[in-house]
């Protein structure tokens, strides 16, 4: 998905890439939509588990905020899934659910700094979605940290 986009998520390209047969693919999955559903379920579960891990983490809120952002930036499948979601409604629904949880988590962190305006959490999440889409040679972690510094300076 990351290298070749959603078109590579069909039985034949997957079998070719893995050096196996289409029959092997169909042994594991009823059909291509079932494979897609399993792939999205796995990402969804992992993304929500990451939010829960951050919720349960110890440490200063600023460090937790940075860690949360860096984990998203470091997930290459995130950007690829968002591209896929533009043409696949079930992927879009899954991403929207994860984004809602992420916004709730971000807002809870920002509330701790006295920043109650939900636009801040939306701006932070938007930067996490957009930074990996940029191909300018920008240090994405440094750019995210600069945004966090700016938002926290308002507290």
Predicted regions: what they are:
Residues 2, 6, 48, 52, ...:
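Short amphipathic alpha-helical interface segments enriched in basic and hydrophobic/aromatic residues
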Residues 2-34, 38:
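Helix-turn-helix
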Residues 31-34, 60, 90:
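Residue-level recognition of oxygen-bearing side chains
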Residues 38, 49-80, 120, 124:
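Hydrophobic alpha-helical connector segments
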Residues 41-47:
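Short, basic, alpha-helical segments at the C-terminal edge of helix-turn-helix-like DNA-binding modules
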Residues 48, 74-80, 89-122:
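Amphipathic alpha-helical packing segments from all-alpha helical-bundle domains
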Residues 85-86:
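Acidic, metal/ion-handling microdomains and their immediate structural contexts
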Residues 92-96, 111-155:
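Hydrophobic/aromatic-rich alpha-helical bundle segments in the mid-to-C-terminal region
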């Amino acid at each position: 998905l990351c290298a070749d986009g959603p078109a590579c998520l069909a039985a034949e390209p997957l079998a070719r890439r893995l050096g196996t047969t289409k029959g092997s693919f169909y042994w594991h999955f009823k059909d291509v939509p079932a494979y897609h559903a399993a792939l999205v379920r796995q990402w969804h579960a992992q993304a929500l588990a990451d939010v829960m891990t951050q919720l349960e983490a110890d440490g200063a809120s600023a460090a937790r905020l940075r860690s949360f952002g860096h984990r998203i930036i470091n997930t290459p499948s995130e950007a690829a899934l968002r591209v896929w979601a533009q043409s696949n409604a079930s992927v879009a629904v899954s991403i929207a659910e994860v984004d809602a949880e992420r916004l709730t988590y971000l807002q809870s962190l920002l509330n701790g700094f006295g920043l109650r305006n939900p636009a801040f959490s939306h701006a932070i999440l938007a930067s996490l979605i957009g930074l990996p889409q940029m191909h300018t040679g920008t240090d994405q972690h440094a750019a995210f940290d600069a945004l966090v510094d700016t938002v926290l300076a308002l507290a």
